[in-house]
Design a protein with these regions (language model features):
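Glycine-rich beta-alpha junction loops
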Residues: 29, 96-102, 152-154, 179-180
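Glycine-rich, anion-gripping cofactor-binding loops and their flanking helix/strand elements
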Residues: 150-198
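Short internal beta-strands
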Residues: 24-27, 95, 172-179
Length: 198
């Protein structure tokens, strides 16, 4: 159905706001059938707008003559994975256009199964040197009212025990985002609903 892609939208919005890596794959009409009102055709180009981190509209399979299709698809898969995981996690969208026949046909997938190799994607890691950490500690201790903001999914980056010790030693007031994964019962210095105060 041309409207089926709309059913993914709530999940994509949730993934966007919760920083959840998600790869959305949709099937589409061929490029030449999109603009003249073919049955059940919805414009799927960037249909999710800024709710996805990355979008690609692939070439129609019959237009890939002379192209190593397996390599082409592996590269797209690697790019999709990288975009969904790098920097801030989030959803990405791959749109696959097809020409008729769309119904199931006989297809030998043996070569794909035998030649399958895992995709290797190297994602950079953020690291901080000791000078930066020392500078951060010095600024916190010299401040009259140091504040720490725990953003969405902060629980994935720091453990409860380490956070509690850090807050206690540096005398921090902590503003806790509802999506951070932490609760105010950890310490009396943790403040929920800080946006109301601000």
């Amino acid at each position: 159905s041309g409207t089926a892609v709309g059913n993914f939208y709530p999940a994509i919005m949730e993934a966007k706001h919760a920083n959840i890596p998600l790869i959305v794959i949709t099937a589409d009409r061929s490029h030449e059938e999109r603009l003249y009102g073919a049955n059940q055709t919805t414009d799927q180009i960037k249909i999710y707008g800024d709710k996805v981190k990355w979008f690609v509209d692939l070439a129609t399979p019959s237009n890939l003559n002379g192209v190593d299709v397996k390599l082409y698809l592996k590269k797209i898969a690697a790019q999709a994975y990288e975009h969904s995981m790098f920097d801030t996690n989030g959803p990405v969208h791959i749109n696959f256009p097809f020409r008729k026949p769309l119904e199931p046909t006989q297809l030998d997938l043996t070569e794909y199964r035998i030649d399958f190799k895992p995709i290797k994607v190297i994602l950079p890691e953020y690291t901080f040197d000791s000078k930066y950490i020392k500078s951060l500690i010095d600024r916190c201790t010299s401040s009259s009212f140091p504040i720490l903001l725990l953003g969405p999914d902060a629980h994935r980056e720091i453990s409860k025990d380490v956070l509690t010790k850090f807050v206690s030693q540096l005398n921090l007031t902590v503003f806790v985002d509802p999506l951070s994964g932490f609760k105010s019962d950890i310490s009396d210095r943790f403040i929920l609903n800080y946006d109301v105060i601000l």
